[in-house]
């Protein structure tokens, strides 16, 4: 047959509890438990397909937006790495705190169905607000308040849905369908990751496309998720006539809170009788004759000895046992949820090239997690779990402990990857220190010797001092200096220069250079026939996430020019040698303009040239991110890009050549181009301040594989554990509290980031790995010595247990227990009973 019959003996009409109290008859219903695939498919609640489809669309919407959110914070709202991490994970905290409100509304007021429908509309509104905000450029006054308002609405929307959808799906199953319920949670999680897989792959593509005059398209990346959220709402409503809609009964959270407060109050009163459990003190002042629920239950069951509050206390006690097991869980989420923030920032620092023409976008690495989830779910269900079960009894808590250990391993791997990434990052001076670079900008073959006390550096033509971690000779190392006084103020340094080669009349050249050092900064000093000048280097790597390098411009002409510049791609399909620059193709045109978009100026600062016969300053232009390719630098003779008018086409864009071009495929480097000599025939010098990324982004694959396996073992099992181990009256509340552990985990990330405890990301990853190992060890101990499995079904019939009017009740309610070997191992094995 396609099913087995589960027969459980009824408690005798005068049975005893573990405390010796008499019980009424407890009939356990006889149900068919379907075990074969044909029978499970035939008896499957079809309405759950609408729920799973809704979850797919909603997760597509959420993850599609969330995938590109960090880049949006970095590049549109102009937040720093730390600020982006704080806001990203802070948003996640809110998304996983608001489920508590959703649970209260669903259980106590309008039910799960109407809660899901109502907040879905709110959710869609938030997505639309965020999409509209993203249509404005970064200088618009709508930022950041409109963006953050949209995110706030989204957080309340997704939070209201989270505790209800999975629980609402579980409500569609009946006693005897436990195997189907377990498969439903796997299907549910599969739909989550199918939606996230597709969205995390295509949202970065939407983001990277030029639109609305920008070289990225966040309106598309946010707009399509908004559309999918509307679709999710419609799909959910499609099954509204066939859902099993359990009516709301009470505000369970409020009732639990009132019960606890009264129990504590009664316990604190002098002369209170000791109880087996502190919650039982609630019954000290409870009178069934004055309680509407007790009277209703007694009338329904025709038994004046029944007490609704005694059963409810039993439910709350089971809730507290589960919540104790939740205490170590936030640490797992503190690791797992760094994929969208800290791991993404790590990916930005890596080489995304699969070839010279093919890029794997950093935010697309999150797609691998979703793809692996889809592969791992059947792999674990069909192969790994059955094979492992032949060697060891598999229980939810054992799976979760294993998942926690794998999460620790994932961050150990991440730390070692970061150690390699660090070799391409700039080593910034410590507090009270500065690094000084000299840059030979002679137009001729002149060698400069720089002396600082006993330290000497020799700079041939076009060379510069820089940090090269791969070159052990140190012949071009930066000068490092410490402040002579305590504090972070500026201080002055003196260097002696000598010249050799085709340097012209050396008697007119500066022999002594005075440099103003700044704490924690890298200062570069340009030296040439014009004299010398100094600037503070911007060491920030580009964060656009589409393979960019960063470049700035300095003009040191012997005549006046402080106008516009443009970088124009030379290998486009429609390239016109007579009109080489097309401002209407943002990915092929980068510009530095001096007065545009309501008086925006891309000139960063003017540096005084010492020793120059001319009064012209060295004009410095801001660093901008440029995509890889074939580029030519031009003087831009008008202002084609301005918010007050339509962008010029290529024929209206006036340019003059500098006769300097290059081909660059590497990403992540930070460059400055100095133009010296004459405007008509400039000599261009290149200074690379920060190395290009050299560690392949593919090295993130091992850590993603391991964290995904951890997710399978911890998160899916946790969903099932939270649902199955709670009494029917507590299911939505327990789901909300399970989600609240994610909020607590992300709060850990936010607090650590705010405290700025780690300068080195690798050290931070190792600390997280160690913390996870310690916490999961505590979790294992709780599993072994504290928790005993108790499996509840969704078939709730209040008050089938009658308890005489006593102050104590048993801590385990046999009415809700069934013989499920996954949760109730052989009682002779005490260890397995717990862990």
From Swiss-Prot:
UniProt keyword annotation of Transmembrane helix present: yes
Q: Tell me where it mainly resides.
A: membrane
In the record, biological process GO terms are: determination of adult lifespan; dipeptide import across plasma membrane; dipeptide transport; intracellular amino acid homeostasis; L-amino acid transport; lipid storage; negative regulation of fatty acid transport; nematode larval development
This protein's GO CC annotations: apical plasma membrane; plasma membrane
Tissue expression, as annotated, is: Expressed specifically in the intestine.
Query: Basic and acidic residues compositional bias: what residue ranges?
Result: 821-835
Which parts of the chain span the membrane according to its record?
Answer: 86-106, 113-133, 150-170, 183-203, 222-242, 325-345, 368-388, 401-421, 697-717, 738-758, 765-785
**Its membrane topology:** Multi-pass membrane protein
Q: Name one GO molecular function term.
A: dipeptide transmembrane transporter activity
Q: Where is this region: Disordered?
A: 814-835
Instruction: Return the InterPro entries for the record.
Output: MFS_trans_sf, Oligopep_transport, POT_fam, PTR2_symporter_CS
Record Pfam families: PTR2
What changes when the gene is disrupted?
Mutant worms have decreased body size, high fat stores, increased uptake of fatty acids, reduced brood size, retarded postembryonic growth, extended reproductive life span and increased resistance to stress. RNAi-mediated knockdown of the protein results in impaired synthesis of long-chain and polyunsaturated fatty acids. Pharyngeal pumping rate is similar to wild type but simultaneous knockdown with nhx-2 results in reduced rate of pharyngeal pumping and slightly higher acidic intestinal pH.
Which terms are listed as keywords in the entry? Cell membrane, Membrane, Peptide transport, Protein transport, Transmembrane, Transmembrane helix, Transport
Q: Where in the cell is it found?
A: Apical cell membrane
Q: Which domain of life is it from?
A: Eukaryota
Similarity comment: Belongs to the major facilitator superfamily. Proton-dependent oligopeptide transporter (POT/PTR) (TC 2.A.17) family.
Its biological function?
Low-affinity peptide transporter that is necessary for proton-dependent uptake of di- or tripeptides, and to a minor extent tetrapeptides, in the intestine. Transport is independent of sodium and chloride ions. Controls the uptake of dietary fatty acids, plays a role in fatty acid synthesis and is responsible for dipeptide-induced acidification of the intestine. Regulates cellular pH differences together with the antiporter protein, nhx-2.
Record's NCBIfam families? 2A1704
Protein name (record): Peptide transporter family 1
Q: What organism is listed for this UniProt entry?
A: Caenorhabditis elegans
Encoding gene (name): pept-1
């Amino acid at each position: 047959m396609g099913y087995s019959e589960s027969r459980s003996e009824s408690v005798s009409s005068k049975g005893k509890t573990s405390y010796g109290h008499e019980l009424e008859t407890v009939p356990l219903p006889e149900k068919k438990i379907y075990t074969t695939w044909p029978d499970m498919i035939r008896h499957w609640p079809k309405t759950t397909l609408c729920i799973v489809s809704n979850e797919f669309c909603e997760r597509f919407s959420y993850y599609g937006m969330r995938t590109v959110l960090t880049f949006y914070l970095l590049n549109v709202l102009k937040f720093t790495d730390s600020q982006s991490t704080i806001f990203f994970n802070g948003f996640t905290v809110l998304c996983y705190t608001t489920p508590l409100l959703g649970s209260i509304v669903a259980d106590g007021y309008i039910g799960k169905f109407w809660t899901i429908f109502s907040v879905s509309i709110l959710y869609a509104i938030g997505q639309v607000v965020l999409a509209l905000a993203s249509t404005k450029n970064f200088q618009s006054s709508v930022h950041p308040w409109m963006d953050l308002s949209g995110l706030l609405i989204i957080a309340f929307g997704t939070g209201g849905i989270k505790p209800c959808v999975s629980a609402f799906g579980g409500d569609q199953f009946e006693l005897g369908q436990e195997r189907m319920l377990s498969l439903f949670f796997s299907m549910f999680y599969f739909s989550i990751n199918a939606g996230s897989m597709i969205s995390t792959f295509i949202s970065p593509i939407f983001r990277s496309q030029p639109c609305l005059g920008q070289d990225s398209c966040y309106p598309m990346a946010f707009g399509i998720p908004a559309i999918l959220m509307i679709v999710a709402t419609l799909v959910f409503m499609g099954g509204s006539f066939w859902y099993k809609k359990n009516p709301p009964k009470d505000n369970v959270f409020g009732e639990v809170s009132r019960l606890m407060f009264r129990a504590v109050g009664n316990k604190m009163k002098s002369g209170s009788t000791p109880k087996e459990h502190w919650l039982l003190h609630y019954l000290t002042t409870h009178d069934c004759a004055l309680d509407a629920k007790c009277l209703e239950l007694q009338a329904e069951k025709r038994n004046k000895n029944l007490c609704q509050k005694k059963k409810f206390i039993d439910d709350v006690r089971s809730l507290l046992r589960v919540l104790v097991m939740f205490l170590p869980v936030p640490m797992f989420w503190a690791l797992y949820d760094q994929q969208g923030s800290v791991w993404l920032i790590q990916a930005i620092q890596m080489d995304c090239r699969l070839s010279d023409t093919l890029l794997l976008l950093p935010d697309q690495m999150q797609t691998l997690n979703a793809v692996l989830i889809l592969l791992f779910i059947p792999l674990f269900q069909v192969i790994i779990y059955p094979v492992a079960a032949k060697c060891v009894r598999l229980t939810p808590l054992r799976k979760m402990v294993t998942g926690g250990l794998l999460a620790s391993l994932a961050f150990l791997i991440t730390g070692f990857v970061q150690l390699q990434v660090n070799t391409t990052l700039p080593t910034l001076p410590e507090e009270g220190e500065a690094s000084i670079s000299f840059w030979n900008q002679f137009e001729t073959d002149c060698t400069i010797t720089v002396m600082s006390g006993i330290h000497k550096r020799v700079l041939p033509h076009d060379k510069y001092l820089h940090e090269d971690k791969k070159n052990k000779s140190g012949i071009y190392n930066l000068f490092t200096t410490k402040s002579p006084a305590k504090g972070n103020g500026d201080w002055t340094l003196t260097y002696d220069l000598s010249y050799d080669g085709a340097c012209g009349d050396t008697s007119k050249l500066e022999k002594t250079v005075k440099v103003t050092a700044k704490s924690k900064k890298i200062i570069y000093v340009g030296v040439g026939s014009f004299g010398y000048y100094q600037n503070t280097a911007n060491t920030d790597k580009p964060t656009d996430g589409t393979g960019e390098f960063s470049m700035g411009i300095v003009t040191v002409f012997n005549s006046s020019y402080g106008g516009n510049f443009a970088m124009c791609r030379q290998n486009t399909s429609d390239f016109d040698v007579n009109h080489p620059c097309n401002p209407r193709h943002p990915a092929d045109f980068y510009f530095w303009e001096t007065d545009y978009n309501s008086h925006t100026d891309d000139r960063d600062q003017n540096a005084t040239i010492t020793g120059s016969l001319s009064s012209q300053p060295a004009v410095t232009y801001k660093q901008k991110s440029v995509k890889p390719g074939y580029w030519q630098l031009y003087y831009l003779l008008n202002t084609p890009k301005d918010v007050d008018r339509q962008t010029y086409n290529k024929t209206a864009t006036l340019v003059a050549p500098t006769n300097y071009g290059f081909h660059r495929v590497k990403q992540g480097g930070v460059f400055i181009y100095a133009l010296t000599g004459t405007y008509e025939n400039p000599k261009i010098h290149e200074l690379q301040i920060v190395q290009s990324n050299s560690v392949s982004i593919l090295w993130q694959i091992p850590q993603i594989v391991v964290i995904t396996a951890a997710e399978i073992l911890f998160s899916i099992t946790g969903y099932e554990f939270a649902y199955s181990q709670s009494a029917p009256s507590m299911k939505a509340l327990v789901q909300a509290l399970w989600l609240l552990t994610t909020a607590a985990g992300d709060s850990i990330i936010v607090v650590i980031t705010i405290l700025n405890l780690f300068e080195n990301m690798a050290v931070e990853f190792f600390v997280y790995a160690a913390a996870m190992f310690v916490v999961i060890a505590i979790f294992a101990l709780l599993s072994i010595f504290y928790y005993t499995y108790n499996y509840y079904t969704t078939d709730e019939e209040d008050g089938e247990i009658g308890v005489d009017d006593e102050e104590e009740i048993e801590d385990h309610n046999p009415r809700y227990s069934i013989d499920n070997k996954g949760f109730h191992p052989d009682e002779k094995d005490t260890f397995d009973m717990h862990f």
